[in-house]
């Protein structure tokens, strides 16, 4: 419920199954763990729903523009955004997310860049720290733009060729001006990766 809540600060969801045995297991787990959604979280979500379309569309548009711009930056070996034709999974994304209602598809405000392998993780961390508008953070869908570096090999097993590309940095685009965010990335590149 990150996007529906409007602030990226509500964690909630649902599990739906046609399997009765699995439904009973899930219900028992829910009862035993005592998990549930608080009234304040529900209120936040209900209050934010009317602006969901506007927020999602804005963040999607900004993320596409910045991701496209990042493709022209030589320090990035790859840009991972499903709407970009060069991005892995683009064809699959088109099948799922492009249709009559949304001819250009929907892709949210999240994308990643793979910083060229010539740069160390220390340099990539310095790049993220040098950003002035982007804040370090793991969330998404909120009004502020966030960035977080991560090393894929420490998170999951991936094919060796993919690991050779470099360190991944995830950007979550908020509501700041696109030109300001691009300028922020550019100044951080010049300060740390050149």
Which ranges hold each PLM region?
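PLP-dependent enzyme catalytic core of the Aspartate aminotransferase-like
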Residues: 118-122, 130, 145-194
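Active-site C-terminal subdomain of aminotransferase-like
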Residues: 1-110, 114-152
């Amino acid at each position: 419920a990150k996007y529906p809540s409007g602030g990226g600060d509500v964690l909630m969801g649902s599990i739906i199954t046609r399997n009765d045995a699995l439904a009973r297991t899930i219900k028992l787990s829910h009862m035993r763990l005592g998990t549930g959604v608080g009234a304040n979280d529900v209120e936040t979500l209900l209050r934010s729903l009317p602006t969901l379309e506007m927020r999602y569309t804005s963040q999607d548009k900004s993320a596409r523009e910045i991701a496209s711009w990042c493709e022209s930056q030589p320090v990035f070996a790859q840009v991972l955004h499903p709407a970009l034709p060069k991005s892995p999974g683009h064809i699959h994304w088109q099948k799922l997310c492009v249709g009559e209602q949304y001819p250009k598809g929907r892709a949210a405000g999240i994308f990643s860049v793979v910083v060229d392998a010539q740069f160390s993780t220390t340099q990539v961390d310095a790049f993220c720290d040098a950003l002035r508008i982007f804040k370090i953070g793991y969330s998404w869908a909120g009004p502020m733009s966030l960035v977080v570096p991560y090393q894929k090999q420490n998170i999951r097993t991936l094919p060796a060729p993919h690991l050779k590309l470099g360190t991944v940095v995830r950007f979550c685009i908020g509501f700041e001006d696109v030109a300001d965010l691009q300028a922020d990335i550019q100044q951080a590149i010049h300060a740390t990766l050149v």
